[in-house]
Amino acid sequence: MFENKKEENYIMYYHGTEIERGRKAVETQKLPMSISDKREQWLGDGWYFFEYERDAYKWIYDMHRSNIKKKKYSDSENLLCKFTILGCELAKKEEREFTNFNQAHFKIFETVKDKLIELEGHEVREGDVFNYLFEIIGYREKYDLVRWSIPMGKKITYPCLRTEKRQQLQI
């Protein structure tokens, strides 16, 4: 008789990082979690991945464009010699994803964001909203990752128009 085996759907995702950090992650099979109070921390504390390798390269370039202008790196080619892209296969389980492509999830996000703005008296970062959802409200038990479409290549302040979107994952 045939077993009703549910196969998991694994997909390759990409993470841009400094070469030494990447080597260490490959050796230990552990990627250090990103935790930051900076505005660039879009999706809260966690591990960041892109669906397309080119977006990981673009992230490296965009994040370090100012260093190129300051001559810390002679040019974008030199910059890419200091960084690497890691590929990671992750199981795709849509029921465990919190995403702005799901109308109910987006409404929850907007409601919590508005409440945090009301409580704090100023705009909040998207990462602050996700940290609140996952750490305070307990969404960590229900969801494994955030799949969020983010604008790329521009200095962004929230709220912003969602143009030039790229999907980014935070686990």
Question: Where do the language-model regions lie?
Answer:
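Generic detector of solvent-exposed, compositionally biased contiguous segments
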Residues: 1, 71, 148-149
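ADP-ribose/NAD+-binding catalytic cleft of ART/PARP-like enzymes
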Residues: 1-42
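Extracellular structured ligand-interaction cores
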Residues: 11, 44-47, 83-87
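Short, flexible loop/turn elements at secondary-structure junctions
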Residues: 13-21, 49-54, 89-94
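Extended catalytic/binding region for NAD+/ADP-ribose chemistry, centered on the ART fold
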Residues: 36-66
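Short, solvent-exposed secondary-structure capping/transition elements
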Residues: 56-62, 69-70, 96-101
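Cytochrome P450 catalytic domain signature, combining two hallmark sequence patches
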Residues: 64-84
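Active-site and NAD+-binding cores of ADP-ribose-processing enzymes
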Residues: 82-171
